[in-house]
């Protein structure tokens, strides 16, 4: 839903200054389909104001600075630096976490551990590309409910296949 809502929001306000001038209610009406609209609209309004006041309307290219902004967690900050600025980062969402576990690339129980493991496993120059590729692959072949090692070509040939087969029924 974010990918559907973002273009609509950016048509209304294409930069932090314009965004900061929108009312919280106007932002809410656009982003409501994403869920948590009241909290997210408040965060978007506030972070836009901060970007204008403290960063001259520019988005910081540093994960630590981004994480200090309202509503911006580690994954979002990582996506921004990777996709907007091309800075190597390996954002781990639920799709990537699930696939990495199924494929035997991590035994991590959370995205922090999974991110650490994937960064060790893959070369830094591949991180940004792999982030997108794994998400797209997961959506097509290895969804949360539908993949038990049978539909996913990687799961059927990975070290996790035996584990997945053992948990079917």
Question: Which residue stretches match the model-derived regions?
Answer:
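Catalytic cores of DNA base-excision repair glycosylases
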Residues: 1-165
């Amino acid at each position: 839903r974010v990918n559907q809502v973002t273009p609509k929001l950016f048509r209304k306000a294409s930069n932090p200054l314009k965004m900061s001038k929108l009312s919280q209610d106007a932002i809410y009406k656009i982003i409501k389909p994403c869920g948590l609209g009241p909290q997210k609209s408040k965060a978007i309004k506030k972070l836009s104001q901060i970007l204008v006041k403290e960063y001259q309307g520019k988005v910081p290219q540093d994960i630590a600075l981004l994480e200090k902004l309202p509503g911006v967690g580690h994954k979002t900050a990582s996506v921004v630096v990777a996709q907007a600025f091309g800075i190597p980062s390996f954002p781990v969402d639920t799709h990537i976490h699930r696939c990495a576990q199924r494929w035997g690339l991590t035994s991590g129980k959370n995205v922090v551990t999974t991110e650490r493991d994937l960064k060790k496993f893959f070369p830094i120059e591949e991180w940004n590309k792999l982030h997108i590729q794994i998400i797209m692959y997961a959506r097509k072949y290895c969804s949360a409910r539908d993949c038990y090692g049978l539909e996913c070509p990687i799961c059927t040939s990975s070290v996790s296949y035996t584990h997945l087969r053992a948990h079917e029924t």
